[in-house]
């Protein structure tokens, strides 16, 4: 019985090839659209939900108006960290963040501009539970002469992730020692485009953090 139904269905499809093609194309487009919508919704619902301490984290932005346009900026003014900790004792930990410029990095005769990076406090890695391939989470980003790389950037510069202790020249003026290598950051994290992190102490040393 089932075989007869299948034969009849095929005959009808062959008799109405144009109509059949339209239906098949419509079905395919509908299925692809449904899958894409599902993936988009999943990405939105999982965005920044990958951290173990998600329910304890709060990202603070600074609202400003320029030329009549109001925006929210996520760079942190220098005094904010100490002031917030003093004003709100319930804050267990805090890290400031300032986006870096596109530094020129040099190792031997290799030079590259890796793109996005950020200056952060020492507590940053632990707060967001970013997984380390190498390095001591309790001690990295403590010195102004350190840098933490992602796995991808470490491989691009050194060809390996076993690079703790190796030195990178920044903009031909600063020598920084690699203190840790992070696993590549997932695409559903706000830090997905960051390929390195620098200590806030380094930012203070070079004088970028005078905003108040």
Residue ranges, per PLM feature:
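A short amphipathic helical element positioned immediately N-terminal to and/or at the very start
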Residues: 5-14
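Short, strongly hydrophobic transmembrane alpha-helices
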Residues: 16-45
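Membrane-proximal extracellular/periplasmic loop immediately following the first transmembrane helix
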Residues: 37-103, 212
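Membrane-interface anchoring determinants
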Residues: 11-12, 20, 40, 76, ...
């Amino acid at each position: 019985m089932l075989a007869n139904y299948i034969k009849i269905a095929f005959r009808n499809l062959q008799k109405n090839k144009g109509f059949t093609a339209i239906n098949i194309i419509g079905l395919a487009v509908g299925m692809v659209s449904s899958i894409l919508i599902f993936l988009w919704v999943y990405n939105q619902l999982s965005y920044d939900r990958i951290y173990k301490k998600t329910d304890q984290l709060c990202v603070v932005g600074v609202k400003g108006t320029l030329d009549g346009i109001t925006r929210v900026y996520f760079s942190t003014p220098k005094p904010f960290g100490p002031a917030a900790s003093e004003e709100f004792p319930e804050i267990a930990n805090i890290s400031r963040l300032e986006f870096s410029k596109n530094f020129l990095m040099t190792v031997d005769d290799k030079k590259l501009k890796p793109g996005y990076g950020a200056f952060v406090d020492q507590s940053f890695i632990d707060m967001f539970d970013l997984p380390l391939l190498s390095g001591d989470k309790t001690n990295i980003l403590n010195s102004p002469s350190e840098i933490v790389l992602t796995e991808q950037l470490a491989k691009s510069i050194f060809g390996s992730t076993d690079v703790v202790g190796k030195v990178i020249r920044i903009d031909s003026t600063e020598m920084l020692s690699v203190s840790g290598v992070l696993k590549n950051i997932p695409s559903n994290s706000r830090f997905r485009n960051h390929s390195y992190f620098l200590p806030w102490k380094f930012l203070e040393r070079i004088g970028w953090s005078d905003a108040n």
